[in-house]
Amino acid sequence: MLYCRQGFEKECAGEIQDKATQLEVYGFPRVFKNAGYVLFECYQDGDADKLARELDFNALIFARQMFAVAAEFTELPSEDRISPILAELGEIDAFPVCGDLRIETPDTNEAKELLKFCRKFTVPMRQALRGKGLLLAKENAKKPVFHLCFVASGHCFAGYSYSHNNSRFFMGIPRLKFPADAPSRSTLKLEEAFHVFIPREEWDTRLSSGMWAVDLGACPGGWTYQLVQRSMFVHCVDNGMMADSLMETGQIKHHMVDGFKFEPDRKNVTWLVCDMVEKPARVAHLMGEWLIKGWAKETIFNLKLPMKGRYDEVLQDIENLKTFLIENKVKFKLQAKHLYHDREEITVHIQVLSNISPH
């Protein structure tokens, strides 16, 4: 089972089909329009576990969470939902002992009405699972996570994910608060990208104060705000106006030029960020040029998706960018995700691993 953004089930299904085939796991996706999730039915026993274990979750763009489904319950009685779940799971020898329990719903308005019930149901379910030996007495972050996903009040999927290969967030969604002084809501996209792409223990070295950053298409400053909050200095590139609150920090330089033509005077930039409304292939190529020239060491950027053929466009743009970097002998790590705060776009992160002299 994979959670995704409502309306992106088709893209999520295409992706899991491709990735499963690469691992020689065969099956078919079951897609329900606007359901906020996709089910991938494996033909062979044990293959769902193989995917949960071996399919790199971070390599999936459109999935917010993935777990192996052990059982589906379609008509749980409202007076006792626990007993049928325990009875069925007790028969499954391969079900692992878990270290955490998450009772969730897909991210749709209809399903989210069940969240209040999910919260209430968590304590009795946790006690019952512990009593049955399916859940450890104490939480253990290294053990698998037990997932119970309710799509209706009597209909749920029970399964598990591996803690080294899942999203650590409930429902796969980081809970971020919009800062009152940020110039636009887009600020949450970059904050979420930091949470998703950069391990927390590396924030002090990779997102440290005193670094220089460039924000292409910066106005009014939603992404710049995140960099300024981390005490960086920022070249803001946009023909529009920046928020006064950011100008007053003394940490930004505003360049009123086209983002495609800007070149930093001093080549001391660590971070390049970009949220320009532009053709995705053009943005991806521009990011590649910056990295190849050694003008930035890390980048986070958005690729706006077309109305049709979204998955194909994403694959093509990322493949072209990877080829461009490899041909220019750049070693790199690339991740891409359809973030919670993204709409018709995906967010890409690239860290350059080569030592490139700016030129």
UniProtKB/Swiss-Prot annotation:
The keyword Cytoplasm applies. One of its GO terms (biological process) is methylation. It holds the Pfam family RLMM_N. Disulfide bonds: none annotated. NCBIfam families: PRK11760.1. Catalyzes the 2'-O-methylation at nucleotide C2498 in 23S rRNA. Belongs to the class I-like SAM-binding methyltransferase superfamily. RNA methyltransferase RlmE family. RlmM subfamily. This is Ribosomal RNA large subunit methyltransferase M. It comes from Vibrio vulnificus (strain YJ016).
